[in-house]
Amino acid sequence: MPLVTSKEMLLDAQKGNYAVGAFNAENMEMVKAIIQAAEELKAPVMIQTTPSTVKYGTLETFFGIVSAEAAKATVPVCLHLDHGSSFELAMQAI
């Protein structure tokens, strides 16, 4: 399933009266584990990244990892920049 937007995910959650888990991931292994757990629970999931993770790699690399894993997922997955450190980084994430 392709990535969904956080807006879509949160609107569905509001309509369905449920919460969505949001988890920080720093590498491919963490992304895979988070999605696997979400699939076991049959729950949508928000994967978050931080400025320090983006600094270590790149936003494009992290987006590629999450996109590839979301495409194989059986539950909705979205990507969120947690605590963006600058306007420029926030705009890049959009």
Regions found by a protein language model. Name each.
Residues M1-A22:
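N-terminal amphipathic alpha-helix/helix-capping segment at the start of soluble metabolic enzymes
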Residues A19-N24, V45-Q48, V77-H83:
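Hydrophobic faces of well-ordered beta-strands that scaffold small-molecule active sites
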Residues A37-A43:
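A short, Lys/Arg-enriched amphipathic alpha-helix followed by its capping loop at the start of a domain
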Residues E8, M30, T53-I94:
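N-terminal active-site wall of soluble small-molecule enzyme domains
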Residues A22, A43-E60:
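Glycine-rich, proline-tolerant flexible connector loops at the mouths of alpha/beta enzymes
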